[in-house]
Amino acid sequence: MSKVTNVSINTKLDELLKGDQVIINFGAEWCGACKVLEPIFNKLSTQYPLVTFLKVEIDKINVHESTKSITSIPTIMLYQKGKKTKEIVSPNETQLRKILDSMK
């Protein structure tokens, strides 16, 4: 079972970003590459229980500080204790595992 939290309210996103280890999948329903990434992201959420996995549909959230740098989707961002530590566009499963392993 996936442990991904869908976020659609800016205040909720602000609160969740303060966690120790957070990974966010920014995408959109109309994005083909996002649909390919989604089951991988969901699977990884069950394998890394100490990381908070979030999904944000960029069309359903107001402009947020974290979305200002997004130029392409899917974009994955990693936050540690409220600070962005990494951003990667259209990652594959190997790349995601590597960055998740680096958070340990």
UniProtKB/Swiss-Prot annotation:
Cite the InterPro entries for this sequence. Thioredoxin (IPR005746), Thioredoxin-like_sf (IPR036249), Thioredoxin_domain (IPR013766)
Disulphide connectivity of cysteines: C31-C34
Q: What is a GO molecular function of this protein?
A: disulfide oxidoreductase activity
Question: What PROSITE patterns does the database record attribute to this sequence?
Answer: THIOREDOXIN_2
The Thioredoxin domain covers 2-104
Family of this protein: Belongs to the thioredoxin family.
Keyword ATP-binding present in the record's keywords: the answer is no
Q: Give the signal sequence positions.
A: none
Q: Which PANTHER family match?
A: THIOREDOXIN-LIKE PROTEIN 1 (PTHR46115)
A Pfam entry, by short name: Thioredoxin
Q: Where is this site: Contributes to redox potential value?
A: G32, A33
Q: Where is the active site?
A: C31 (nucleophile), C34 (nucleophile)
Q: What is the lineage of its organism?
A: Eukaryota, Amoebozoa, Evosea, Eumycetozoa, Dictyostelia
The organism encoding this protein is Dictyostelium discoideum (Social amoeba)
What superkingdom heads the lineage?
Eukaryota
Name the keywords, alphabetized.
Disulfide bond, Electron transport, Redox-active center, Transport
Please give the CDD domains that the UniProt record associates with this protein. TRX_family (cd02947)
Q: What is this protein called?
A: Putative thioredoxin-4
